[in-house]
């Protein structure tokens, strides 16, 4: 299981985002932080099969998912 940040397009409801969070946890993943400020989304440990389903969803032109990116440490130097 790897850590990812899933972000959603503007206007996506909290209920819609919750459905994706529920899918993560029902498949054995863990939700980390929820983002509901400048971006809407969440960080999570996501099972490979769930990640694949999210990536397929994100590839559809009218998908509510904006991005799925590996969660990593960012530094400024």
Specify the residue positions occupied by each region the protein language model found:
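Short amphipathic alpha-helices in soluble, non-transmembrane regions
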Residues: 17-27, 53-62
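Autoinhibitory propeptides
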Residues: 32-77
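Short, surface-exposed ligand-recognition loops at beta-strand->loop->(often short) alpha-helix junctions
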Residues: 7-15, 46
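Short structural boundary motif marking the start of a folded domain
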Residues: 1-4
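Intrinsically disordered, low-complexity segments enriched in small/polar residues
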Residues: 9, 26-30
């Amino acid at each position: 299981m790897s850590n990812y940040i899933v972000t959603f397009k503007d206007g996506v409801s909290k209920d819609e985002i919750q459905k994706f969070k529920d899918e993560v946890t029902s498949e054995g993943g863990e939700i980390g932080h929820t983002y509901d400020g400048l971006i809407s989304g969440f960080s999570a440990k996501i099972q490979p099969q769930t990640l694949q389903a999210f990536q397929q969803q994100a590839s559809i032109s009218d998908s509510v998912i904006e991005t799925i990116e590996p969660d990593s440490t960012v530094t400024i130097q």
